């Protein structure tokens, strides 16, 4: 006997649940790729990605996952023998560094932890010591989905500036964009990368790079450029150049709808929704942790991400809990990865997710803990409910931060004065 019959819920940190409206937008025939409506879709997506990244720079769409965006960022701005400084806080910045090393880039990793965020003071000290200016770029992730750490990107930018260093600042926003503020121009970020399958609520298969003025200048002398990733090729005169071939039409249809949904809700409301859902999850975890077995992976409360929470489980097999949650209850939780393989599990609260979805997920986690006899404090779900009650008092109607047509919402969004296509 199981309780899983019905719609399975995906509570992993990517891919995330795809809204029905996005799926419906994709359910259509292929169309002409050289003229007509698809060109409007491409150019509107490129422009709205600038709004999401908050940049006046250029944006590029790749038929690739986030690792493709990593390679595009590196190959378009750096040359063989260049040195980069990798700021680890989990699995993914070091993995980006491994990719850089495979391209002939010299990689230096700062001492890092899965439990603490990047230390801006240490970054400043290392860059001050680089008096010859050998470090050409600093690589960091805003949110690492393995550890669930959120790094303070503005503070790292201030550290770079305090050191008087000219390195490019490259930020992976794959697990953060459209879940929390990301101010590319305001924070002095030179390159931002993300993927379609997390906060952007689109199926996997697209990745995006945003390039600022300094990155575009570095592109002119980069010798790692290859035909597919090359920004110069992507700026060619034909629509075909935007994708270096046939456009991924149906993913673009889905992306267009997902962007409409984000602007319709309003980005401030999107960020606040993620913050409240994350806080409710953390309230539940704090109660469960009273059992002495389950604990937050991230030891610094303010460095706990609003898109995913990683939980350590001491003395018990996380796989058993994940198996019960999926096979009995129909909720798929995230496995521990990297250094947390077989030691942790992850609860996602990103993208197309709301209060009943989170309460269902948290209820299944608490049910699984009880069913498997894993010691835990009682009342975690109630703590999450209390958080919702405190955070969202009855307003008597629809939240004023959202609503309206997608076109009107885009028009009301802060303009970025992006260059035309």
Model-identified regions with their sequence ranges:
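N-terminal "arm"/small-domain region of PLP-dependent enzymes with the aminotransferase-like
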Residues: 1-36, 419
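PLP-dependent enzyme catalytic core of the Aspartate aminotransferase-like
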Residues: 2, 339, 343-421
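Active-site C-terminal subdomain of aminotransferase-like
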Residues: 17-18, 197-284
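Conserved N-terminal alpha-helix of the aminotransferase class I/II PLP-enzyme fold
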Residues: 25-72, 91, 95-101
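Conserved PLP-dependent catalytic core of the aminotransferase class-I/II
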Residues: 45-52, 260-297, 323-324
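Conserved PLP-anchoring active-site segment centered on the Schiff-base-forming lysine
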Residues: 78-94
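Active-site phosphate-binding strand-loop segment of PLP-dependent enzymes
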Residues: 118-178
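Conserved PLP-binding catalytic core of the aspartate aminotransferase-like
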Residues: 294-328
């Amino acid at each position: 006997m199981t309780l899983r019959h019905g719609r399975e819920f995906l509570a992993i940190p990517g891919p995330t649940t795809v809204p029905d409206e996005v799926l419906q937008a994709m359910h259509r025939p292929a169309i002409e790729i050289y003229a007509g409506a698809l060109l409007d879709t491409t150019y509107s997506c490129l422009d709205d990605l600038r709004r999401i990244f908050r940049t006046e720079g250029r944006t590029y769409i790749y038929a690739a996952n986030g690792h493709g965006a990593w390679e595009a960022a590196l190959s378009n701005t750096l040359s063989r023998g260049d040195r980069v400084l990798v700021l680890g806080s989990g699995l993914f910045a070091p993995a980006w560094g491994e990719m850089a090393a495979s391209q002939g880039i010299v990689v230096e990793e700062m001492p890092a932890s899965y439990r603490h965020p990047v230390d801006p003071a240490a970054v400043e000290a290392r860059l001050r010591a680089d008096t010859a200016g050998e470090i050409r770029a600093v690589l960091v992730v805003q949110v690492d989905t393995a550890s669930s750490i959120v790094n303070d990107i503005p503070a790292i930018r201030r550290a770079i500036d305090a050191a008087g260093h000219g390195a490019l600042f490259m930020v992976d926003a794959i697990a953060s964009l459209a879940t929390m503020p990301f101010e590319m121009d305001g924070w002095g970020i030179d390159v931002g990368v993300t993927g379609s399958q997390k906060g952007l609520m689109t199926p996997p298969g697209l990745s995006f790079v945003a390039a600022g003025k300094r990155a575009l200048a570095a592109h002119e002398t980069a010798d790692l450029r290859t035909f597919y990733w090359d920004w110069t090729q992507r700026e060619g005169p034909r629509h075909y150049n935007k994708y270096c071939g046939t456009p991924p039409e149906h993913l673009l249809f889905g992306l267009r709808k997902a962007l409409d949904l984000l602007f319709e809700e309003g980005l401030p409301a999107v960020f606040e929704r993620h913050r409240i859902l994350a806080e409710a999850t953390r309230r539940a975890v704090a109660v469960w942790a009273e059992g002495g077995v389950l604990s937050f992976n991230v030891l610094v409360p303010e460095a706990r991400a609003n898109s995913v929470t990683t939980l350590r489980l001491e003395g018990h097999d996380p796989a058993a809990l994940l198996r019960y949650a999926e096979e009995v209850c129909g909720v798929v939780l995230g496995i521990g990865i990297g250094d947390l393989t077989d030691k942790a599990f992850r609860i996602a609260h990103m993208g197309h997710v709301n209060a009943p979805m989170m309460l269902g997920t948290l209820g299944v986690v608490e049910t699984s803990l009880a069913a498997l006899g894993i010691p835990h404090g009682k009342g975690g779900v109630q703590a999450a409910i209390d958080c919702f009650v405190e955070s969202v008092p009855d307003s008597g109607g629809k939240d004023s931060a959202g609503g309206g047509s997608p076109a009107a919402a885009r028009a009301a969004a802060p303009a970025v004065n992006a260059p035309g296509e």
